[in-house]
Swiss-Prot record:
Function: Forms part of the ribosomal stalk which helps the ribosome interact with GTP-bound translation factors. Is thus essential for accurate translation.
Keyword Iron: no
Alphabetical list of InterPro entries matching this protein: Ribosomal_bL12, Ribosomal_bL12_C, Ribosomal_bL12_C/ClpS-like, Ribosomal_bL12_oligo, Ribosomal_bL12_oligo_N_sf
Gene Ontology cellular-component annotations: cytosolic large ribosomal subunit
Identification of the protein by name: Large ribosomal subunit protein bL12
Superkingdom: Bacteria
Subunit structure: Homodimer. Part of the ribosomal stalk of the 50S ribosomal subunit. Forms a multimeric L10(L12)X complex, where L10 forms an elongated spine to which 2 to 4 L12 dimers bind in a sequential fashion. Binds GTP-bound translation factors.
Primary gene name: rplL
Length: 121
């Protein structure tokens, strides 16, 4: 049986048949199909970093077009003119906390479009 024939035979197996094959190989060769602990720990840490779902949107710098940034801040946060101006003038300031990833990315894009520098934390 060639390597390609073996791979094709494995592709045609059901999940139960594959499970039985793995167990038979473990018994026959005295090995384990389980991943080493060190590798599993690293994979878990990477997964945890990627799973962050809430972000703080921070205005790091208003840039040169402060009026446009103030308008964008008002639109995105619902703040009044005075409050939005205070945030923009006092940068770096947190605009919103605990924002979903998609909403945070949208806010960042809109504010960067008008010249602001935004950080997601």
């Amino acid at each position: 049986m060639t390597r390609e024939e073996m791979i094709q035979a494995i592709k045609e197996m059901s999940v139960l048949e594959l499970n039985e094959l793995v167990k038979a190989c473990e018994e026959e060769f005295g090995v384990s199909a389980a991943a080493p602990v060190a590798v599993a720990g690293v994979a878990g840490a990477v997964g945890a970093a990627e799973e962050k779902s809430e972000f703080d949107v921070v205005l790091a710098n208003a840039g040169s077009q402060k009026i446009k940034v103030i308008k964008a801040v008002r639109e995105l946060t619902g703040l009044g003119l005075k409050e939005a101006k205070e945030i923009v003038d006092g940068a770096p300031k947190t605009l919103k906390e605990g924002v979903a990833k998609e909403a945070a990315e949208e806010m960042k894009a809109k504010l960067e479009e008008v010249g602001a520098t935004i950080e997601l934390k």
